[in-house]
Swiss-Prot record:
Highest classification ranks of the organism: Bacteria, Bacillati, Bacillota, Bacilli, Bacillales
This enzyme's EC code(s): 2.7.1.92
InterPro entries linked: Carboh/pur_kinase_PfkB_CS, DKG_kinase_firmi, Myo_inos_IolC, Myo_inos_IolC-like_sf, PfkB_Carbo_kinase, PfkB_dom, Ribokinase-like
Entry keyword set: ATP-binding, Kinase, Nucleotide-binding, Transferase
Catalytic activity field: 5-dehydro-2-deoxy-D-gluconate + ATP = 6-phospho-5-dehydro-2-deoxy-D-gluconate + ADP + H(+)
Gene (UniProt): iolC
Family: Belongs to the carbohydrate kinase PfkB family.
Protein name as annotated: 5-dehydro-2-deoxygluconokinase
Record's function text: Catalyzes the phosphorylation of 5-dehydro-2-deoxy-D-gluconate (2-deoxy-5-keto-D-gluconate or DKG) to 6-phospho-5-dehydro-2-deoxy-D-gluconate (DKGP).
Keyword Signal: no
Pfam families: PfkB (PF00294)
Gene Ontology terms describing biological process: inositol catabolic process
PROSITE patterns (alphabetical): PFKB_KINASES_2
First-level EC class: transferase
Amino acid sequence: MKYTFNEEKEFDIVAIGRACIDLNAVEYNRPMEQTMTFSKYVGGSPANIAIGSSKLGLKTGFIGKIPDDQHGRFIETYMRNTGVDTSQMAVDKDGHKAGLAFTEILSPEECSILMYRDDVADLYLAPSEVNEDYIAKSKMLLVSGTALAKSPSREAVLKAVQLAKKHQVKVVFELDYRPYTWTSAEETAVYYTLVAEQSDIVIGTRDEFDVMENKSGGSNEESVQHLFAHSADLVVIKHGVEGSYAYSKSGDVFRAKAYKTKVLKTFGAGDSYASAFLYGLVSGKDIETALKYGSASASIVVSKHSSSEAMPTVAEIEELIAAQS
């Protein structure tokens, strides 16, 4: 079974949300207190997905807000050099800074992130900075859940979703739950549900779906039936090492295993999964194959030091799938 898009659109995917800085520990197997060296990368889920999609050959655009400083210029330059169209990146003139994420790699199973997200530039993206014509030119709009955490970014994203629906652009909601950005579970559930019910494709972990539903121990079947009663026609729920499942509105269920790899760190997997899964869909592969692409891409990224820099090529993904088929 394949998923169809409007092939007349100029862009394959336009992502909206945060682009920030990842500072990944160079020294492994030690706590952050003892870590002296970090490597700098572009980070943030929608930025990573845009970069990953571009590296896979998709025509990709990005809508977001970056600071008017060295970090902001680094983010824009890096994304532009990977092929992402950055013409819709607004520059913050009010002194807000880029979000910073310091990563700690105690072991492959014990990784943590220390976030600096107070008053960050990406959450100041205004509705007036969302261009209708730009969104109308894309096959899909990729929305990240974290962009809903604060105003005015929240309203900018809601406007983008409305414009996408108006112009028959598929809305893809990557749940991307980061608890440090939200003030309450109730607030998260309200805004996640609001966007999920307007989305054509919803992607997240089982835990993230529980956050959206504001409960624990939820079932995949209940989650997808609720979304299918609204706009969704494809829902992907990831279960870590148990693999991932895609549910179609027509009643089909597909599963992809988690590919074996030597894990270095646990972060970055979700972004690489989304970019490769969406690549599979938009390039005309069936849903089951797209799931395999997502799972294989995630496996590759967790074996490497960075997230954005480690986003794989199509050849690398297909090589891993062939090796473990």
